[in-house]
UniProtKB/Swiss-Prot annotation:
Bilayer disposition of the protein: Multi-pass membrane protein
Protein name stated in the entry: NADH-quinone oxidoreductase subunit H
Compartments it resides in: Cell inner membrane
Catalysed reactions, as listed in the record: a quinone + NADH + 5 H(+)(in) = a quinol + NAD(+) + 4 H(+)(out)
Gene: nuoH
Single biological process term from Gene Ontology: aerobic respiration
Length: 358
């Protein structure tokens, strides 16, 4: 695509060297649009799917009025939020009040720059892709803190402090789990990590993917990922029975929609990261001799992402919400020690004769 646009502007339109630069910029913009539009549509229908799944688990119907089987409900919700007035508390900080939602949403979009869907479908294939993801996602905490403080509300500020403390705490356990994957893969490039899972003692089958040899740390990662995104049962930052809606409480209309969009995009991002790091990315679970279903492709990447997203919805519908002190205790006294201990165990394992990743 990049070469096509560069040839278009340089040769066809006669812009010379300037056309090469313009073609590069245009190709990047087109790639960004190709990623963002399906991502936003996915968020819209993820909310629909969530309400349907939870309704089914609770013996309800879920959305079924707007359009056939309620399929237009996400668009109705979007129009409702867009046309609602964005009210602001009189004593709030006006500038920071509107900066908060933007700072929460921007990192969730920027993180997708390094996520590959197969060997070729990636905006930027850099060797420190995992480090970039950890860095860019940690910036969203600033948006939460700013929103809570700028609202000039005790409920908003308490929710922001809870959310930021929880995210920072579980980032440590999550990072420890990802360090284990880097140790066995020898790279922070996502394509290299997927390629490493295609090898191994199990001959590139589903049993050679990182979820099995790193199973204890895989569980630590899954729990930390849910807490990191402030989703149920770790949603004390939005505890309805205690602090109404946390740092969202003073937001309405489009400003609230930005927070909502950021939360669900982070969910999808975590599902993509889980697929790449532990579930073989675009690798097929079937032998390549089986034809199409055995061929590595973006299709399998999307299937695995959907499975992880379903897991998010399943635990929301089945587990009660933890108290805040229980969440922090689980993170600092259970998951973080397990994460660091497994790094040591894995290091010893890799230098022993029983090394599976030679």
């Amino acid at each position: 695509m990049q070469e096509w646009f560069q040839n278009l502007f340089a040769a066809t339109l006669g812009l010379g060297d300037l056309g090469i630069t313009v073609g590069l910029v245009v190709s990047v913009i087109v790639k960004i649009v190709i990623i963002l539009i399906p991502l936003i549509l996915t968020v819209a229908y993820l909310t629909y799917f969530e309400r349907k799944v939870i309704g089914f688990m609770q013996l309800r119907v879920g959305p079924n009025v707007t359009g056939p089987w309620g399929l237009i409900q996400p668009f109705a919700d979007v129009f409702k939020l867009l046309f609602k007035e964005v009210t602001r508390p009189r004593l709030s900080n006006k500038a920071l009040f509107y900066i908060g939602p933007i700072m929460s949403l921007a990192p969730s979009f920027a993180a997708w720059a390094v996520i590959p869907f197969n060997e070729e479908w990636v905006l930027t294939n850099i060797n420190i892709g995992l480090l970039y993801i950890l860095m860019i996602t940690s910036l969203s905490v600033y948006g939460v803190i700013i929103a809570g403080w700028a609202s000039n509300s005790k409920y908003s500020f308490l929710g922001a402090m809870r959310a930021s403390a929880q995210s920072i705490s579980y980032e440590i356990a999550m990072s420890a789990a990802l360090v284990c994957v880097v140790m066995v893969s020898g790279s922070m490039n996502f394509s290299d990590i997927v390629a490493a899972q295609a090898k191994g003692i199990a001959g590139g089958s589903v049993f050679s993917w990182n979820w099995l040899p790193l199973f204890p740390i895989f569980i630590v990662y899954l729990i930390s990922a849910v807490a990191e995104t402030n989703r149920a049962p770790f949603d004390v930052a939005e505890g309805e029975s205690e602090i109404v809606a946390g740092h969202h409480v003073e937001y309405s209309g489009f400003a609230f929609a930005l927070f909502f969009l950021a939360e669900y995009i982070f969910m999808i991002l975590i599902s993509a990261l889980t697929s790449l790091m532990f579930l073989g990315g675009w690798l097929s679970p079937f032998p390549q001799s089986w034809g199409f279903i055995g061929t590595p492709s973006a299709f399998w990447m999307f299937v695995k992402m959907a499975a992880v997203l379903y897991w998010y919805l399943w635990i929301r519908a089945t587990f009660p919400r933890y108290r805040y002190d229980q969440i922090m205790r689980l993170g600092w006294k259970v998951l973080i020690p397990i994460g660091f201990a497994y790094i040591v165990v894995l290091g010893v394992w890799m230098i022993s004769p029983l090394n599976l990743w030679k």
